[in-house]
UniProtKB/Swiss-Prot annotation:
Listed name of the protein: Protein FAM193B
Modified-residue entries (Phosphoserine), positions: S764, S776, S882
Encoding gene per record: Fam193b
Keyword ATP-binding attributed: no
Organism name: Mus musculus
Main location: cytoplasm
Record field: compositional bias (Pro residues): 28-37, 248-258, 274-285, 309-321, 637-650
Ranges of biased composition (kind: Polar residues): 587-597, 610-621
Keywords, comma-separated and alphabetical: Coiled coil, Cytoplasm, Nucleus, Phosphoprotein
Source taxonomy: Eukaryota, Metazoa, Chordata, Craniata, Vertebrata
Coiled coil residues, start to end: 485-517
Amino acid sequence: MTRRRSRPSGGAGRRERARAAGLQKPQAPEPQPPPPSLEAGAGAGPPEVPAELDCDGPREEEEPKLAPGPQVPPTSSQSVQTCCLLCHRERKGWEEGPSQNGLVLQGEKLPPDFMPKLVKNLLGEMPLWVCQSCRKSMEEEERQTGGDHAVAISLSHTSCKSQSCGGDSHSSSSSSSSSSSSSSSCHGNSGDWDPSSFLSAHKLSGLWNSPHSSGAVPGSSLGSPPAILGEAFPVSEHHQHSDLTAPPNSPTGPPPHPASLIPSHPGSFSSASYPPPLPTTPVAPFPAQASECPMAAATATHPSGPCQSPHPPSTSMPLLKMPPPLSGCSHPCSGHCSGHCGGPLLPPPSSQPLPSTHSRDPGCKGHKFAHSGLACEADEGLGEEEDSSSERSSCTSSSTHPRDGKFCDCCYCEFFGHNAPLAAPTSRNYTEIREKLRSRLTRRKEELPMKGGTLGGIPGEPAVDHRDVDELLEFINSTEPKVPNSARAAKRARHKLKKKEKEKARLATEALKQVNRVSGSQEPRPARERLLEWPDQELDRVNSFLSSRLQEIKSTVKDSLCASLSMCELSVESSGFKEGTVEAQTLTPSDLSGSSQKRPDINLDLSPLTLGSPQSHTLQAPSEPVPPWAERRDPHPPPWTEVRGPPPGIPENGLVRRLNTVPNLSRVIWVKTPKPGNPSSEESSKEVPSCKQELSEPVATGGKPKKSKRQGSQAKKTLASPAPWSPANLEASGAKSQVSSPKQPSKGSEPAKVGSGAEPGEGSPGSRPGPIQADSPKTDKKGSSWQNWPGGAKARTLEQESEQTPGPARPQSLSQGKGRSRRSRNKQEKSASSLDDVFLPKDLDGVEMDETDREVEYFKRFCLDSAKQTRQKVAVNWTNFSLKKTTPSTAQ
């Protein structure tokens, strides 16, 4: 309050000085106003501080500065020079672009960023910049100078000084030093304002100046603050800050400011009355400067709060009403800038110093809307009213003037203001705003207790609850309270319950799914999924069964292998072959075609049992279907077991041998996979003469068209080359499936015995590991199957190697006597090459093949690659592990 009072008193002196200086300054500054505008823009900010600090000194400095123009004014009367210079500059620039001080020219568009800052700055700056004395000085300077530059400079300096005298100009000029005190007191936001904000304010002031130039002298007052703004945004900003500070203080002590403003403003007012002519005169001689000067004058008037006062009535008005002067200031701004909406808007910020807060917000807009002094006065009244309700008034003022409705009271945003005044309304009367806020808070607090009371059951006594403890506990624990708070609790409880229910449902569904998976999940699942899972399930089933039956099978296989080995050594293949190929012999009568047809079935059975069987089939020309069968086996492990039925079929001696040698295994497989099982094999054997029948039957019996097709293809191959099969069977199928064609039962019998002994081994291990290692049937046949069956597998491998050698012989030879395998190899040197043909994939290019054969070749490739990889991985990994174990330090 003391600061404000001192400001007013100092402001009065300053304004008087400014007036005197204004008279003096205009002459010197006339030539220099344009340069000062440049310098003021740069250096106005700092000079303002001195102006504020020393009312007289700054005045004097301002006068000299006004004379030098841009250079001197920025320092001492920076606000004045800045306003004038900036007004000219900014006015020109702002006229070019959107007015950024919240005062938007009718044809201008304000950038959203500048709107708030400009509004705030203008609200703060316009009152500070536009002191009555400054206005008068500006007007007088304009008149005397006859040049817009001189008038603008003097007015700007005068306005700055008068503003400081009013506590606005000096506060603004000393905003650097005194912005915290006088400036901050004038404008609580002054500290917050940035030079950029000032720039926007300057731009706004420039806009105002353009309107002011077109408008009345009050506009020239405003123009002076814009000039300061243009001169140095910091300076104008300081002025604005003082104004902005003043608005907060002005709410605190609006009367002191009005008083101080009034005294200084009276001079201002007298000069304010001049400003109208000045703007008019400057407009004619120098429209740009005239408008700027009018803006400065308006600014000076606004700070005084008698922006209206600038008019004789407005002078009395500021004294009468502090808020009205603010609104009055804004009004004079609008009156001065009546032509320029932006002008009035900016002036309210300038007038903001004390009343300027009010005038800045609604007053400015209202005044803006009122483009004449009368309108300003009317706006003054409105300004007071608006001051009382700055927010509402700001909106009202904006509503009064459509152009002014671009700024919002709270954030000064031009878009959401819906005709809200500039920043002035919020900043101009902080006391009223605070009171409103307090009242609102009080109402809310009252409403809250009412709500609490309703919760408690008694709206008036929310804290008191007469319910029993049990009731209270129930209420607290209840999930469905009817009270508002309880409603929230009930909501939460409901949400929790829903979540729990959802969780339970999800868990139940998951459990059901798991149960279905474990028990009958396949049934609900689509047939495709079931089929996909079927192989794995069958593999597990077969593996478990094989493991359980392993010992029995091993013993049986060992016996059969021993018999077959002895038979091979003694070259007594008939017995072994008969045993191993009882069904094979049956097929032999059925001819190669029949045997070949059965072979596919056997291959299907044996391949699932032992990967070696597909290999042996591969060895045979028609054995290619065996790999397809193996493929089927891979996708459908149960089919392999199903194929077990065909083993009785004699398609491949090895397979038949396996089945005969390991009848239990074949039976087990049969039991596990009864689909293709015996029916398929039996039917195939029965229908051996016709491959088509065999194929169709395996499909129907086995229920797996793939295998039946492959079998059929194999049968077709065998039928196509029945003669080759007799030798090819001995050689090609010598490895595993030496299908002793009916033509060559003796030769085939020996390999068949060995194959039967070895292949049963293969078959048993193969069927067991085969399902497990379906990916690499060859490897499983040779290595994994026999390795899995150390005893029986070895015997089998020996027999197979002796008879079949190449495919199964390799793993068999590795597992058991290589000598026997060598003997068999010697016997089957030709079959060795055939083994490569069988096991190694053939070039599919340029070769005519069935789809089944092609699938077999693909399967061979797959098996070969997988087998190699598996072997390499095992060897390398085991070696590394062993090395690491032996040398733990190295391993580490």
